[in-house]
A protein has these predicted regions:
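Short beta-strand/loop segment at the start of cytosolic alpha/beta domains
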Residues: 1-14
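Amphipathic alpha-helical interaction surfaces in cytosolic regulatory modules
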Residues: 18-86
Length: 86
């Protein structure tokens, strides 16, 4: 399975729901989606079940740029925290 992106504009910004897997090859398209979104961005990871290290580093960068990450699985959240502390 590849990455599916569902984008929803809302009053206070944009919610981008990600479904499937996030790999290095997906990051270019995902970055483009973020650049085309409203200033307040939420990434919904509820349906993400697999990521690679490049995806984790991307998510660390997103949080540093004030992108909110919702519905993140525990293993992804812990990996983000470990990567951030490096």
């Amino acid at each position: 399975m590849t990455l599916k992106i569902e984008k929803r504009a809302e009053k206070l910004g944009t919610t981008i729901k990600l479904i499937g897997q996030i790999h290095q090859d997906d990051l270019g398209g995902l970055k483009a989606e973020l650049q085309q979104s409203e200033p307040t961005i939420v990434l919904d990871l509820e349906e993400i079940f697999l990521v690679d290290v490049d995806a984790i580093r991307f998510l660390v960068e997103c949080e540093a740029q004030q992108v909110k990450i919702n519905n993140c699985s525990l293993y992804i959240r812990e990996w983000i925290q470990r990567e951030r502390s490096r």
